[in-house]
Amino acid sequence: MAGLYIHIPFCESRCIYCGFYSTTSLKLRDDYTNALCREMQMRPAKAALGSNETIETIYLGGGTPSQLNGSHLNQIFSAIRKNYTLAENMEITMECNPDDVTGDFCETLKQLPINRISMGAQTFCNERLRFLHRRHNAGEVEEAVTRLRNIGIRNISIDLMFGFPEESLSQWMSDIRHAIQLDVEHISAYSLMYEEGTPLYHMLKQGKISEIDEEYSRKMYETLIDQLTGAGYEHYEISNFARPGFRSRHNSSYWHEVPYIGIGAAAHSYNRKQRSWNIENIQTYIRSISDGILPSESEQLDIFTRYNDLITTTLRTSDGINLMKMEQEFGKELADRLLQEAQSHISRGLMKIKNGRLSLTREGLYISDDVMSDFMII
């Protein structure tokens, strides 16, 4: 089994916090779509993964994939069917902005095999949405969910953000409760990050806004966990919550070392032995593909790199690391090292071993980066 990621780097406007590679120029959509389809032809599963793996999940991310029209999307799915072996019970996700979920967009969706939508709600406060330079308003999130339900989409995920400058705990509670009332199947929630190079980062450095303190951010995170688990959501990854049976299969594959193929500018591929990534620049990507050249670089993964990857991905999940499988794959020496390093964290209540799995406790989740860094082999 394997996953397929398609990167759509187009956005109508750019949010002030976004550090992902994207462009607000839409004039290259036709050429870019053609290049995506050509890359799929040039990068079959056997070449990308070393074997003809069956694709079980597809994820259209960005950017904003909903900036493509029906013709573009039909062209992409035609190329997917032509170049890959597809499983029967697939999860096919598309990211979109709430204001893109119009009647016309829903008519397009009805003609496509997409069965999961991931929307960036971020907050239900219009003032904070304007602060982020988001295009939609709070009411459009509800309208989008209703429209998607009406065309038969039964797996909807929304993203939330917390830790806005001067955001109160009651305001954050209001956002969480609003999300619960929408009764979506999946919720992802992230602390607002000040990534270098973004407008938000410059506002912080210029003293125009202040970052909330770490203890207050922790309180917000704990409130998130309490509210969502109390409403019946499973907390299955540091930032992700799902109704039973609705965990993101595609993202879970990243966290459990499942191979995946990345198509498009800046997309990454992984097959357990090698990691590769495409060039970011869209025009260079299109030109290279047109010339029959895959614009990518790669690195071979030695056992220590793979071990580090295991730590930084699998420990993010509630499942944690299967210790028996870990020893079978990495050998007794590394398995013993892992257990030895874990003892101090277990004694401090940051980790636990249950049913042969090593995982973070609730106390360990908030400082997961610090905990995981202790296991890394430099």
List each language-model region with its residue ranges.
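C-terminal scaffold of the Radical SAM
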Residues: 1, 22-46, 54-332
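A short, conserved structural fragment
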Residues: 347-356
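Short, amphipathic alpha-helical interaction segments positioned at domain boundaries
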Residues: 363-378
